[in-house]
Design a protein with these regions (language model features):
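Amphipathic alpha-helical repeat scaffolds
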Residues: 1-2
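Non-catalytic C-terminal accessory modules of carbohydrate-active enzymes
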Residues: 6, 11-171
Length: 171
């Protein structure tokens, strides 16, 4: 999963997270598991255990990659905010850190991309937004933002922010 996000293939990663066939996290729920299994299904490994850490990948992939929250310095002094929603239209998360919760809501509309983020006290964050096609404008709390394109990636760097609440809009 990490490799898919590193390769900027968030769409396939989203497909892996949300698929419902017998080789999926959804199937683990369907077969009655209350925690992650060792294999996708008993038919692939009849002697599997029903408490296996590898299957818990979505528990760290969703906050770190889909929502894009990762520490850049020890103790989350500086965080990176780099959501990769792919075709997902909306997501909301509260990510606990040692310095307090990062709260995020992302809307991925046809005409605008909206990132609402709250950074706790004693933390700052570098913000990345998806690179849209064609002409675009970026605002933060209604004011224009000068952004730079990230070399070799489909992202814009919107700058470093301190603690507080922000609404970034790309349209």
């Amino acid at each position: 999963m990490d490799a898919l996000y590193e390769a900027n293939d968030a769409e396939y990663a989203l497909h892996m997270l949300t698929k419902t066939d017998d080789r999926s996290w959804y199937n683990m729920i369907r077969v009655g598991s209350t925690i992650s299994l060792e294999a996708w299904d008993n038919k692939y490994k009849p002697n599997q255990d029903w408490n296996h850490a590898w299957g818990a990948a979505p528990a760290n992939i969703i906050p770190r990659r889909l929502m894009g929250v990762e520490p850049l310095t020890p103790g989350f002094g500086t965080a990176r905010i780099k959501p990769q929603l792919a075709s997902l239209e909306w997501a909301k998360a509260t990510i606990p850190t040692i310095r307090g919760a990062i709260r995020m809501e992302v809307e991925n509309k046809a005409d605008a991309y909206i990132l609402k983020v709250t950074i706790p006290a004693n933390m700052d964050a570098e913000v990345y937004l998806p690179l849209p096609r064609g002409k675009y404008t970026v605002t933060n709390n209604g004011a224009p933002v000068k952004v730079s394109r990230v070399k070799g990636e489909p992202f814009l760097y919107a700058g470093k922010i301190g603690s507080g609440s922000y609404t970034f809009v790309v349209n």
